[in-house]
Amino acid sequence: MIRFLGNIEVRADAKGRVFIPATFRKQLQAASEERLIMRKDVFQDCLTLYPESVWNEELNELRSRLNKWNSKHQLIFRQFVSDVEVVTPDSNGRILIPKRYLQICNIRGDIRFIGIDNKIEIWAKERAEQPFMSPEEFGAALEEIMNDENRQDGER
């Protein structure tokens, strides 16, 4: 199982090529993951990079919740899968971020790779603090979640 951790700053070149941080590359290699799936995040102005096996699990989960005979569900599935890029790191460990993604997420030059469990988020450096709470908000939210009385005893 892959678990990406960390917040690593890198620089994209003029063509949108960027080195995948070495710690993340090592994990991908250890898991024999060669292909990555890139898409615009559903909720944030960042890109999400999935190892192919993780993407397939996410896709299977989504598909299992959708009714293929429901037109709204068809639209949701189409939108989710239609704008993805399959990327393979080159021999130097670089990937190319397509221009449309650079524009949509306002990514230029310095960027941040943030490990989020089994996937990686790619942020414009100046927006990389946007998805975080203040330390006080984070502490209160975590306390609320971890002290939730509705959890089963085995989940603590």
From Swiss-Prot:
GO terms for molecular function: DNA-binding transcription factor activity; transcription cis-regulatory region binding. One of its GO terms (biological process) is negative regulation of DNA-templated transcription initiation. InterPro entries: MraZ (IPR003444), MraZ_C (IPR035644), MraZ_dom (IPR020603), MraZ_N (IPR035642), MraZ_sf (IPR038619), SpoVT-AbrB_dom (IPR007159), SpoVT-AbrB_sf (IPR037914). The keyword DNA-binding applies. One of its GO terms (cellular component) is cytoplasm. It holds the Pfam family MraZ. Its main location: cytoplasm. It is found in: Cytoplasm, Nucleoid. Residues 7-54, 84-127 form the SpoVT-AbrB domain. Disulfide bonds: none annotated. Coiled coil: none annotated. Keywords: Cytoplasm, DNA-binding, Repeat, Transcription, Transcription regulation. Forms oligomers. Belongs to the MraZ family. This is Transcriptional regulator MraZ. It comes from Bacteroides thetaiotaomicron (strain ATCC 29148 / DSM 2079 / JCM 5827 / CCUG 10774 / NCTC 10582 / VPI-5482 / E50).
